[in-house]
């Protein structure tokens, strides 16, 4: 695929994403939900289709997609299988970090294998979001020591690399490092990383754990970035938009199933509303407050789309393992997963019928 001209390569990636979502992921989604396991064939299908490197620039071996092309592919994959896509989505943040890092040796070591999907990556940055932070970094002579808690880390046991972020105890800067998961000290040692499985009601196959980190040594050679806390939160707007693809992926699947159920007018209107919500989200990229509001609108739309599907399917939607039943649980996951406190507060106010705070 890399030998194609750029326009053809972009078109091929979109076509491949649709094929993987509809022919590989969605037919297996009920089984993934039932067993709590994403089959290894899903990861191979994504890698073979070139979908691990969609966020990489051309100079890093990527396709050089426009941002809207990246988000469309993310939506498409979410419409196939939420557990697979949510785990895979985390990978792109690591690819972006590696493509921008001043740490040339780390980039040379890891960028190419992450772009191709030969190495799969996850992230643990939620520990730096609250104040005081849950995850801290203390400077040593040749690196850092990370200590703290990361409450939700997906892909445990399936990813090869983990980008973990912590806040410097002296400057409050955010330090991000990429560590091979196979080398993390997980035994009961003074410098252990302990993983406790988190039992989720939806997307359980994401293999999500809670990490307790006690004195983890992080050499400078593994540090991918160091930014101020203000710069970190500014950069989070991109992450909010990428995670904003989750509700649109759910709407895509619900509308397709509404078409099958003979409810084409309802499906058409939901697609129109999704287009409007997507435009609002894209136009708010430079305004964190407006971005949260648009993300809340998208999450609410996903819930309404799956409610329409449940109503259309009737009693069948009450059967454990039906598409509508699974998607309804996944809508609750999408309401709160990968979201900031202000988004949750906004959703509470909107569902309660309270006015937005000014």
PLM-predicted stretches and their roles:
Residues 186-217, 228-231:
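Flexible, small-/acidic-enriched active-site or ligand-binding loops
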Residues 316-358:
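Glycine-rich phosphate/cofactor-binding loops in nucleotide/flavin-utilizing enzymes
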Residues 37-48, 52-154, 158:
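Glycine-rich flavin
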Residues 125-127, 139, 150, 165-168, ...:
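Short, structured patches in soluble enzyme cores that scaffold and shape functional sites
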Residues 212-242, 255-265, 278, 282:
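A glycine-rich, basic-preceded beta-loop-alpha segment at the flavin cofactor/substrate interface
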Residues 242-304:
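Extended amphipathic alpha-helical segments enriched in small hydrophobics
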Residues 1-19, 353-358:
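Actinobacteria-biased recognition of intrinsically disordered, low-complexity terminal regions
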Residues 152-193:
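A short core secondary-structure module
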């Amino acid at each position: 695929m890399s030998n194609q001209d750029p326009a053809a390569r972009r078109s091929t990636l979109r076509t491949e994403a649709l094929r993987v979502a509809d022919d590989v992921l969605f037919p297996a989604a009920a089984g993934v939900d039932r067993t709590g396991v994403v089959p290894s064939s899903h990861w191979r299908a994504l890698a073979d289709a070139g979908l691990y490197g969609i966020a990489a620039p051309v100079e890093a071996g990527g396709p050089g997609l426009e941002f809207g092309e990246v988000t469309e592919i993310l939506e498409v994959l979410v419409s196939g299988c939420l557990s697979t896509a949510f785990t895979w989505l985390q990978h792109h943040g690591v690819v972006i970090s590696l493509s921008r890092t001043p740490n040339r040796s780390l980039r040379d070591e890891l960028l190419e294998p992450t772009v191709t999907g030969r190495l799969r990556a996850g992230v643990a940055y939620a520990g730096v979001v609250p104040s005081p932070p849950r995850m801290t970094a203390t400077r040593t002579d040749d690196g850092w020591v990370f200590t703290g808690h990361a409450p939700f880390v997906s892909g445990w046991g399936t990813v090869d690399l983990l980008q973990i972020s912590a806040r410097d105890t002296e400057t409050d800067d955010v330090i991000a490092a990429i560590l091979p998961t196979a080398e993390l000290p997980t035994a009961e040692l003074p410098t252990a990383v302990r993983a406790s499985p988190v039992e989720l009601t939806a997307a359980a196959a994401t293999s999500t754990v809670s990490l307790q980190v006690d004195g983890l040594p992080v050499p400078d050679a593994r540090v991918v970035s160091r930014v101020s806390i203000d710069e970190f939160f500014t950069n989070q707007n991109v992450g909010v938009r990428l995670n904003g693809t989750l509700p649109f992926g759910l709407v895509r699947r619900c509308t397709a199933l509404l078409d099958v159920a003979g409810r084409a007018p309802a499906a058409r209107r939901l697609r129109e509303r999704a287009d409007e919500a997507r435009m609002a989200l894209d136009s708010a990229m430079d305004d964190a407050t407006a971005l949260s509001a648009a993300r809340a609108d998208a999450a609410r739309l996903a819930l309404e789309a799956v409610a329409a599907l449940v109503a259309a399917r009737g009693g069948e939607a009450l059967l454990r393992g039906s598409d509508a039943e699974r998607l309804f649980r996944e809508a609750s996951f999408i309401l709160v997963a990968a979201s900031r406190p202000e988004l949750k507060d906004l959703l509470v106010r909107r569902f309660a019928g309270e006015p937005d705070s000014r």
